[in-house]
Amino acid sequence: MRKALCLTESLSAIAENSTTLLNLNRRLTGLTRSGENRNALKLFADVHRCTTLRPDQYSVSLAITTARHLRDTIFGGQVHCYAIRSGLLCHSHVSNTLLSLYERLGNLASLKKKFDEIDEPDVYSWTTLLSASFKLGDIEYAFEVFDKMPERDDVAIWNAMITGCKESGYHETSVELFREMHKLGVRHDKFGFATILSMCDYGSLDFGKQVHSLVIKAGFFIASSVVNALITMYFNCQVVVDACLVFEETDVAVRDQVTFNVVIDGLAGFKRDESLLVFRKMLEASLRPTDLTFVSVMGSCSCAAMGHQVHGLAIKTGYEKYTLVSNATMTMYSSFEDFGAAHKVFESLEEKDLVTWNTMISSYNQAKLGKSAMSVYKRMHIIGVKPDEFTFGSLLATSLDLDVLEMVQACIIKFGLSSKIEISNALISAYSKNGQIEKADLLFERSLRKNLISWNAIISGFYHNGFPFEGLERFSCLLESEVRILPDAYTLSTLLSICVSTSSLMLGSQTHAYVLRHGQFKETLIGNALINMYSQCGTIQNSLEVFNQMSEKDVVSWNSLISAYSRHGEGENAVNTYKTMQDEGKVIPDAATFSAVLSACSHAGLVEEGLEIFNSMVEFHGVIRNVDHFSCLVDLLGRAGHLDEAESLVKISEKTIGSRVDVWWALFSACAAHGDLKLGKMVAKLLMEKEKDDPSVYVQLSNIYAGAGMWKEAEETRRAINMIGAMKQRGCSWMRL
């Protein structure tokens, strides 16, 4: 738009061209629409002082609108006075614009007074008064006005009441008004339908479906805003199928950008891959994606290749520099563990907001790169970006050295965030992970507010730092605290881990009883912890009972039972459990599954079963073999006396995972068990090169020599331990006599 002419030029143009009021009003309209409200006010003021041209009702209405945009109380009052003096208040649009002005200024008293001065208020006057009353907090007055209205047959009046109640938090009243409106035969419009649908959530699905029927009956299924509201309603009610059905039934011509955005965002929120298919449909419909489209799509990308394509399209359409999209791009790459790409996006941004910095710190936290996260925070501090609780929460979640952790805590105090419960909890966890359980406990005790996360942090902190009884004591304090806080699945799983570390079957059984009493057995995490607890405490039958009683089983559930059988030497049961898992087909085995079942085969001597399972890993399940898998199979072959095959497998493992000490140790142990001197010497030489200061290699080799009757070599090997400076750890007993 052209810049407004200066005051002198405007007046001369008016004089030279015999400008009429129509031209003046056009000029005022142009300035107002282009956002040049100050220039519009200057033009009106100078025209008002000009004797050759007098503003009419339209000029005054435009001036009032301009004052409303600027929230200019003084000028608005002056125009109001001019309208009174010039007799222009009799025009409805002047009076209505004044009502809008006082609503914007928050002056309900002046608005009421002005409304009372209107002889015959129209629908706009009534709706402005009602909307202002709700907006400015006088809800009782709004209902008083509504009840006294002579006629209430206009849909705009009802929409104002329904919207006002909704925005004031009176959702039930909005629904009642909607129903009353329907009973009275007032025809709903698309605005009313969209408003009432936006209030439907999971608890009001039936009402939402009733409104859906009314929409179809009233013929508003062709209105984009109503269709969008319907789709949103079904997503809010967690009925994804119906949301998608509404989208599919909507005419292609009705679907707009918002429609696709609503569906994509809804599906992404439920982690549904169909969001990408809808995105493709949007592109095929020649609709340009918005920044919100890219944010939703990137949030649902689970494939790195697809993520790169979406990022490329964002660049092509010019959205890559939008902060919202850039932040989503960084988060997406972090989810793929492509932290280099996330860093590249971060560095390419000329403007970074707080969310951008927090996202980068969070990415480094996810990558366990504490120093890099701290480096980003220092840059942020240097340029003067003020951190928030999310910044420090991400920083504290990284692996920080103690001195850095203390520095971060000092910054938290400096920015006045230490009182926030999220920060307090993060500090407790950070100090616990750093082995500073006393500092963590001190922070916990000094915390004025404690929630369940606080208790979980200190209980697990004591457990992981080797103080299970102190953790148990804190759990007792949680149950006895004045503020009633019920333990969750994480709390109880930690408590069951404490039972394992203290070998307390009685406490574990009591915890199991607590779980049943409080109806928390449905939590898969607790079921898994119970299976592990019972097996570790020696009662595998109880582990099996818990497993069979679980309504939902994940891969950890199956792994826990397989490990339990392996721990108790019941290899055949472990293999049978693995086969049952395969037959059911509900859960896909992971790397831990194969580690557990191969270990069970090893201890039970099930060579054929172990080889069959090992060979199926990559081909049938796509699980990459790791050091645990090779170690277990080498141990299995070694225990069975197949040392040649075990040696061959070790060499194969070197090509796959490199030379790993654990795998060689499995072969070395087999050599010792079967007295294979030749192979044992070869493996011992290799291990001595890799672990020069480990005395156990020498001890094992000495035992092999002794088993072969080579006492001299055995003694020389023992003496070699002292020569290299290694020392065998002394045996001891933890039992007191």
Curated annotation (Swiss-Prot):
Repeat is among the record's keywords: yes
Q: Which UniProt keywords apply?
A: Repeat
MF terms in GO: RNA binding
Where is the segment annotated Type E motif? 663-737
Query: Which terms does the UniProt entry file under GO BP?
Result: RNA modification
> Which regions does the record annotate with the repeat PPR?
20-55, 56-90, 91-121, 122-152, 154-188, 189-222, 223-253, 256-289, 290-321, 322-352, 353-387, 388-418, 420-454, 455-485, 488-522, 523-553, 554-588, 590-620, 626-656
InterPro entries referenced in this protein's UniProt entry, alphabetically = E_motif (IPR046848), Pentatricopeptide_rpt (IPR002885), PPR_At4g14850-like_plant (IPR046960), TPR-like_helical_dom_sf (IPR011990)
User: Would the keyword Repeat be found if you checked this record's keyword annotation?
Assistant: yes
Q: Give the top-rank taxon of the lineage listed in the UniProt record for this protein.
A: Eukaryota
What protein family is recorded? Belongs to the PPR family. PCMP-E subfamily.
Record's protein name? Pentatricopeptide repeat-containing protein At3g49740
Name its species: Arabidopsis thaliana
